[in-house]
């Protein structure tokens, strides 16, 4: 009997084909909440999960489950420790989207530095003089602070180097670098003209960027968050943006997604908002789907996965 794999309905066809060629039965769902998966496919041996929260449940409800493969890098939507204790691997796809996220990070930095979206919106209203009171700034010579220096952070640093930016790095797990300078946490906030976040969310850093950090930042500084919404205290960020304690922000991730339409972020002119598009290219989606599928294949064939974030 074929083993079943639960997948998102919108998973790239290359990912689906990889699993089909390996001989698995696919259960395609739009709703990948734990309750939906248990109800629809309790016999499944694997789940490919995107960014939706996945609740813990009694493993006896899915006794064949061996792997939850995250389609992406972050895994704060699944309790890896809980599943490891229940004999289920949680895996990620760390090599699939680093360059894409770095490119999108710089697209948002460029947008803010040149007021592209704001100027385009005003032009559509017939306000051709908006540009005269909203001039941009050059990136060359500016200081880019990078918090989190993994695969994505390193790619961002390479791009910043091309723009002749000064690069500062904060990552407590990194001891040496051949690009930029390592600084302490306080200095990354106080010295950066643009600060970009590329860290995983942990219990230690959840909502760890707030009023104190915004007070340290220059009032001309920009915050770029394509990492995770939970890294930032969003109420305190709203206050900092309203009171111009920092000049602006580009936000691609939020505590609640989609961002509710009544969010005050929509009312602020100094914020660029995008709906979690950091890795939203055809190439990255295909890469993540195939890498997640290959992790499933390894585990269901009795092998160890390449990118597990937990132990069983």
Please give the residue ranges for each predicted region:
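C-terminal helix-to-coil terminal segments
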Residues: 2, 84, 91-104, 118, ...
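Phosphate-coordination loops involved in phosphoryl transfer and adenosine-cofactor binding
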Residues: 2, 65, 140-143, 211, ...
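Glycine-rich Rossmann-fold phosphate-binding loop(s) that bind the pyrophosphate
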Residues: 149-150
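N-terminal glycine-/charge-rich "phosphate-binding" loop or analogous flexible N-terminal tail
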Residues: 1-44, 164-168
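Phosphate-binding beta-alpha-beta segment of Rossmann-like dinucleotide-binding domains, i.e.
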Residues: 94-143, 158, 162, 170, ...
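N-terminal Rossmann-fold NAD(P) dinucleotide-binding loop
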Residues: 153-154
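Rossmann-like adenosine-cofactor binding region
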Residues: 53-59, 172-264
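Phosphate/diphosphate ligand-binding glycine-rich loop within oxidoreductases
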Residues: 45-123
């Amino acid at each position: 009997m074929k083993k079943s794999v639960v997948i998102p309905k919108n998973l790239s066809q290359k990912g689906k084909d990889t699993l089909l060629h390996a001989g698995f039965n696919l259960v395609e769902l739009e709703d990948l909440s734990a309750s939906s998966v248990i109800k629809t496919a309790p016999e499944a041996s694997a789940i490919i999960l995107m960014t939706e929260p996945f609740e813990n449940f009694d493993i006896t409800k899915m006794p064949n489950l061996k792997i939850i493969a995250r389609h992406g890098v972050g895994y704060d939507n699944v309790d890896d420790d809980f599943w490891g204790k229940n004999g289920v691997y949680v895996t990620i796809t760390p090599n699939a989207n680093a360059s894409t996220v770095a490119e999108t990070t710089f697209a948002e930095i460029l947008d803010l530095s040149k007021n592209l979206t704001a100027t385009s919106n005003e032009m559509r209203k017939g306000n051709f003089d908006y540009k005269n009171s909203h001039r941009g700034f050059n990136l060359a010579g500016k200081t880019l602070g990078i918090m989190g220096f993994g695969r994505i952070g390193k790619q961002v640093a390479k791009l910043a180097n091309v723009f002749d930016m000064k690069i500062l790095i904060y990552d407590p797990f990194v001891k040496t670098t051949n690009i930029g300078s390592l600084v302490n946490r306080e200095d990354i906030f106080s010295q950066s003209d643009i600060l970009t976040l590329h860290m995983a969310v942990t219990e230690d850093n959840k909502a760890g960027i707030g009023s104190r950090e915004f007070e340290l930042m220059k009032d001309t500084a920009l915050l770029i968050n394509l990492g995770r919404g939970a890294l930032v205290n969003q109420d305190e960020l709203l206050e900092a943006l309203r009171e111009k304690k920092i000049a602006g922000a580009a936000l691609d991730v939020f505590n609640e997604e989609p961002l509710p339409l009544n969010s005050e972020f929509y009312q602020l002119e100094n914020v660029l908002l995008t709906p979690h598009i950091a890795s939203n290219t055809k190439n990255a989606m295909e890469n993540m789907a195939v890498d997640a599928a290959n992790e499933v294949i390894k585990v269901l064939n009795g092998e160890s996965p390449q990118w597990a974030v937990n132990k069983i």
